[in-house]
Structures are given as structure tokens and as C-alpha cells.
Regions:
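Bacterial N-terminal signal peptides that target proteins for export
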Residues: 1-6, 16
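Predominantly soluble domains enriched in secretory-pathway, periplasmic, or organellar proteins
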Residues: 12, 17-170
């Protein structure tokens, strides 16, 4: 009986879901912005909506690319990173967190001018970065299987969430 209830519910919901997906307009290319000299590959992207900047983890260059979306050009490249993979702008702390796979560190930059304000050592393969705006926390996947919970005010790891494998994306 439960199986039939689930099938009935799915059949009623399915047209609404597929209709919503097909009713929206397709994406339209508005502009192309060359990233400049990036050797190797890029990884995750972050966005600073306030300043209209795209943040590009340039893993192959060991740098962070900063793109001015309003002007449609690269503003700068921040060197000295170690295989940056994850990047996120943290609006409630006006800072940028960059996770580095090469040395397992997280570099923290001031949002206004992207100058360094801190560094958090996670030990191994820091990767993806996510922002929890409800709890005012930053989450960074790292190592063989963990999420570091970071307080963006004290710039310290306050907890670990253990996982069964490396969190490539979450």
C-alpha cells in the first residue's frame, strides 16, 4: 500500500517539477572574460557580490585570480599560495578564505583589499570551502575525511566533522 502511495505522490509531483525546469529561459552568454596566464588548471570559484568580484582558485599557478565582473577584466593575481583549490567570500566577516591542498592551510584575506589577515593550519589537502551564513561559520573539507568548522572572527578551527572519505565537494 505504501508503495502505491509513493507512486501516486511521485506522479502528481513529477509534472510540476519537470514543468518548472522547462519553463525557464535558457542561459544566455553575456560576456567572455579572459583569465590571463593560468598554467595548469583552475579549481573552485567564489564571488564577492558586494564588490562584483569573481575569485578564481588558480591551482596550476599557486595563486588566486581576482576578476572585476563590472569592468570585465582581471584585477590582480595573488601569489604565494600552495595549490589553492577552494575559495569563498565571507560577507559577515568581509573576508576571503582560500583552502590550499599543497600544504593543508587556509589563508584568510581582508575583503576590502585582499591583504593577508590570518592562516589556519589543517594539516592535509584543504579543498572545498563553504560559508554557513546562519551560524556564521566557514566549513573547509580536508584530509582523508573531515570538515573543519572555522570561526571567521577568531580565525580558529573550533570543531571537526569526521567523514568516511575526503570531501571533494559538499
Amino acid at each position: 500500500m505504501l508503495r502505491w502511495v509513493i507512486l501516486l505522490a511521485a506522479s502528481l509531483i513529477w509534472p510540476a517539477v519537470t514543468g518548472a525546469q522547462t519553463a525557464s529561459a535558457p542561459l544566455i552568454l553575456e560576456a567572455k572574460i579572459p583569465l590571463g596566464q593560468v598554467s595548469g588548471r583552475i579549481d573552485h570559484l567564489g564571488i564577492d557580490v558586494k564588490r562584483r568580484r569573481l575569485l578564481v582558485a588558480e591551482l596550476g599557478n599557486n595563486s588566486l585570480g581576482v576578476v572585476d565582473l563590472a569592468a570585465g577584466k582581471v584585477l590582480s593575481s595573488i601569489a604565494g599560495l600552495s595549490e589553492p583549490q577552494g575559495v569563498a567570500y565571507v560577507p559577515f566577516a568581509d573576508s576571503v578564505f582560500v583552502a590550499n591542498a599543497g600544504d593543508g592551510s587556509v589563508h584568510v584575506l581582508r575583503g576590502e583589499n585582499l591583504t593577508p589577515i590570518g592562516r589556519i593550519e589543517l594539516g592535509d589537502d584543504a579543498d572545498n570551502v563553504r560559508v554557513d551564513t546562519a551560524r556564521h561559520r566557514v566549513l573547509v573539507g580536508y584530509g582523508k575525511g573531515a570538515l573543519a568548522v572555522i570561526d571567521p572572527v577568531s580565525l580558529s578551527k573550533i570543531a571537526d566533522i569526521r567523514l568516511k572519505a575526503h570531501p571533494e565537494g559538499f
